[in-house]
Amino acid sequence: MALWGGRFQGETSALFKLFNDSLPVDYRLFEQDVVGSIAWADAIASVGIITATECSDLKKALNELLVEVKGDPAIILASGAEDIHSFVESALIAKVGDLGKKLHTGRSRNDQVATDLKLWCQSEGAALVARLQTLRSELIALAEREFDAVMPGYTHLQRAQPVTFGHWCLAYVEMIERDLSRLTDALKRANTCPLGSGALAGTAYQMDRHSLAVALNFASPTLNSLDSVSDRDHVVELCGAASISMMHLSRMAEDLIFFNSGEAGFISLSDEVTSGSSLMPQKKNPDALELIRGKTGRVYGSLVGILTTMKALPLAYNKDMQEDKEGLFDVVDSWAICLDMAALVLSGLVVNRPNALLAAQQGYANATELADYLVSKGMPFREAHHVVGVAVVAAIAKKIPLEAFSLAEFRTFADIIEADVYPNLTIEACLAKRDVLGGTALTQVKQAIAAKKVI
């Protein structure tokens, strides 16, 4: 039976029930709904709506229901209830009779679902924080393993300057740390309890909402009932934090897909995160990384979906807000498995050092060093930039690297070039000169890894 049937004389259509019911989605809030109901039983007992004995009986029945459903989750969907709140209330009434009908006194499904959803976000958010920390640890471990593996750094997907693989790993550590900061910050703002806000104007019973918030492990109660039941910022922020983090995961996946390609060959991926072709027996495809990249779009879509749903809703609650959960659940599921998969990919990744080094030695990645050398001899940088550009054109025409020019040939570009130019053009010199905070010099990479390990 619907919780709102008294107002209606006619039956709802089967199509409307199918359209209106949210149980196939919000069943995932079952545990939170029971926990919130237990706290609410204590709250209404505190203001004399039910006796201490009745409160104890309600809480016992709710805890029994929690155990039963954990043992057989299928009973929720088999119930045919309108939503998770209806399921819990009906199951409670089946256990304790008319006493179960007292539990909803002073409470609306509006503040109930707002509370359930915040509890769910807090629980899932804590698990996501742990996953981000695991991925961060894997990146740091990989950076330490491969801190001195040389590879080309890219701009515009063209070889630019040599860097180390450790430096590349640490770049993504920075991104993951920002993801952690964003998520924990969002969870702080979501750490307020809407329960007791009623449908929109506040409950009519003079209960202590601070105690209610503490009972549910919230930092504090919400302060405005209209906002409390209509606020979905926590959903938007969690989807937003996920979207930015997925962008980072997608960028990392794209880098690794390229590094793993036959055209680059800088890394090898473990068999456990790759798959083959049904036709081409030689293929070893980076499917885990491609799926991370692909799932990013659906996370973005859910963020846009909740923003669009909320953008024109008047205060307070509207049925549109029932659409907040499906996208949120998909976002959290997608983000969680992508974080787990990214960590697994990194744990089995091996750098093919000879290939990566050879690529770093090609493409005139030491051209900037030649320009800096000319600057050290007194030439203005803009002029040095032009001179080296001319030298690169000549080297390309001769199909040789810059360091293959003879001293006489070098002096046709600038007569200030001496024999000491050659040590400046080695890969080792290119790296060593970037010995500045945040640079790719081995000393800096080692220091950065050490600093990250103590955080």
Curated annotation (Swiss-Prot):
This is Argininosuccinate lyase. It comes from Shewanella sp. (strain MR-7). It catalyses: 2-(N(omega)-L-arginino)succinate = fumarate + L-arginine. Coiled coil: none annotated. It is found in: Cytoplasm. InterPro entries: Arg_succ_lyase_C, Argininosuccinate_lyase, Fumarase/histidase_N, Fumarate_lyase_CS, Fumarate_lyase_fam, Fumarate_lyase_N, L-Aspartase-like. SUPFAM superfamilies: L-aspartase-like. One of its GO terms (molecular function) is argininosuccinate lyase activity. Pathway: Amino-acid biosynthesis; L-arginine biosynthesis; L-arginine from L-ornithine and carbamoyl phosphate: step 3/3. The keyword Amino-acid biosynthesis applies. The keyword Coiled coil does not apply. Gene3D superfamilies: Fumarase/aspartase (C-terminal domain), Fumarase/aspartase (Central domain), Fumarase/aspartase (N-terminal domain). Its EC number is 4.3.2.1. GO terms for cellular component: cytosol. Keywords: Amino-acid biosynthesis, Arginine biosynthesis, Cytoplasm, Lyase. One of its GO terms (biological process) is L-arginine biosynthetic process. Belongs to the lyase 1 family. Argininosuccinate lyase subfamily.
